[in-house]
Amino acid sequence: MSEIVVPRQFRGPPFTANGGYICGVLANAVGGRGVAMLRSGVPLDVAVTLQPGEEGAILLTNAESAVLGSARPADDSQIPSPPPAPPSVEEARAFAAASQFAQRSLHRGCFSCC
């Protein structure tokens, strides 16, 4: 078991940690390729606990032992091989221009929601 505290700089939606950041923490705790799932918002600047689950899984729990997220080792069938090709710069710009969120952020101050 180990405690982590997500610093405010990794904020996602108001008062919670960025989901991508937390999924990365969970997958890293599995010790290799993993499949992560969030179940609830992870608070900022509050200790939460990473603890072992069944069959190599990792659980992220709060002080009340509620499971906030989990990760488990991924088998090869869950990982595309080869991975999908990234979009071209032109494709990414076209998508951004067409997005309803291109000019505004849903969550101001979010680590990656810009």
Where are these regions (language model features)?
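Hydrophobic beta-sheet segments that form the core/acyl-binding groove
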Residues: 34-70
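General N-terminal targeting signals
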Residues: 21-23, 51-53, 75-77
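Non-catalytic linker/capping segments at the edges of enzyme domains
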Residues: 1-3, 63-65, 72-114
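Active-site helix/loop of acyl-thioester processing domains in fatty-acid/polyketide metabolism
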Residues: 2, 9, 13-35
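Surface-exposed beta-strand edges and their flanking turn/coil or helix-capping segments
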Residues: 17-20, 49-51, 82-85
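Generic hydrophobic segment detector
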Residues: 30-41, 109-114
